[in-house]
Amino acid sequence: MDQILVKAQTLIEALPYIQKFNNKKVVVKYGGSAMLDPELELNVIKDVVLLKLVGMQPIIVHGGGKEISKWVSLLGHESKFVDGLRVTDEVTMEVAEMVLGKVNKHLVQMVQQLGVKAVGISGKDGATLCCEKKLVNGEDIGFVGNISEVNTDLIDTLIKNDFIPIIAPIGLDKNYMAYNINADDAACAVSTAIGAEKLAFLTDIEGVYQNPEDKSTLISVLTLEKADELIQEGFIGGGMLPKLKNCIDAVRSGVSRVHILDGRREHCLLLEFFTNKGIGTAIINDDSILFEHESGMKEG
C-alpha cells in the first residue's frame, strides 16, 4: 500500500479517540528507563506535546529515583529501601529536592522547545500535595510522605492558562516540613483529584500478563474484577503489585482508564491512546463502555 495512504489511514484511525478525549485531562506518570535515554525522553515529551496540540489537557508527574540514588552515592551515602520506598533522612531529602527540581526544569525546557508552554512545580507550590509521615509496617522511614489531600487550585490555573503542569512529587505536612512522595502515589492522587479521564504509568514492562512467565499473555483490557482476581491468586508480584493497586484505586475513585505502558517503546502514549490495538494494559471499571474493537480484548 502507498506509504502516504498508510499515514492517512493512521490519522483516520486516531480521529474517534481525538474526538472522545478532546478537552479531557490526562495524567502521565513519567519514570523508569525512559527518563535515562535522551532519545526515549524526547519521544515521550513529543507524545505529551501532541496530546496537548490535539485538544487534550496533559499533566506530567515525574519521578527521578535512579538519579537520586546516583547523587546519594556520590555524597558517600547508601540508598536504602523498605518495601520499595526510599528511606529518606535529612541528607537524602535535600538530595531528592535538588535532583527532582533539576529534572523538573529539564522537562519544562524540553516541552517549551517544542512550542508548548509548561510550568514546573513541586507539590510544595500552592500546597498542592499535602501529606503526613508514612509508616511502613509501623517503621519510621524518615521524610517519606503519604498524601492526605491534593489542592488542585494551582494545577487548574495552569491548565486554564494553556500551560502543561509538570509536577515533582514533594509534599508538605501540616508543619510545612517537606516530604518525599512516591511518584506513582502522587500521580494516582493527582489524577483522582483533578477528575482525569486517563492516567498512564510509563514503566519498564509492557503491561499486565495473565501469566507473568509467558510474554504472549499480555492483557489489553483488564477489569477491576479480573485485576483483583490476579492479585488474590498470586499472579502479580514485585514492583507490579503496588502499581496495579494504585491503578485499581484510581479507577475506583473515578478515573475512567488507567494504562500501564512500556516507556521504552517509541511513542508509547500515541500508540496506546490513538490506535485500535494499543500496546499496553488498560485497567477499566467492570461496567465501562468499551470501544467497538475491544469486545474481544477484555479480561474480566
From Swiss-Prot:
CDD domains according to UniProt: AAK_NAGK-C
Pathway the protein contributes to: Amino-acid biosynthesis; L-arginine biosynthesis; N(2)-acetyl-L-ornithine from L-glutamate: step 2/4
UniProt xrefs under InterPro entries: AceGlu_kinase-like_sf (IPR036393), AcgluKinase_fam (IPR004662), ArgB (IPR037528), Asp/Glu/Uridylate_kinase (IPR001048), Glu/AcGlu_kinase (IPR001057), NAGK-C (IPR041727)
GO BP terms in the entry: arginine biosynthetic process via ornithine; L-arginine biosynthetic process
Gene3D superfamilies tied to this protein: Acetylglutamate kinase-like
Residues reported in the UniProt entry to bind substrate: 64-65, 86, 180
The protein's name: Acetylglutamate kinase
Species the sequence originates in: Lachnoclostridium phytofermentans (strain ATCC 700394 / DSM 18823 / ISDg)
Taxonomic path: Bacteria, Bacillati, Bacillota, Clostridia, Lachnospirales
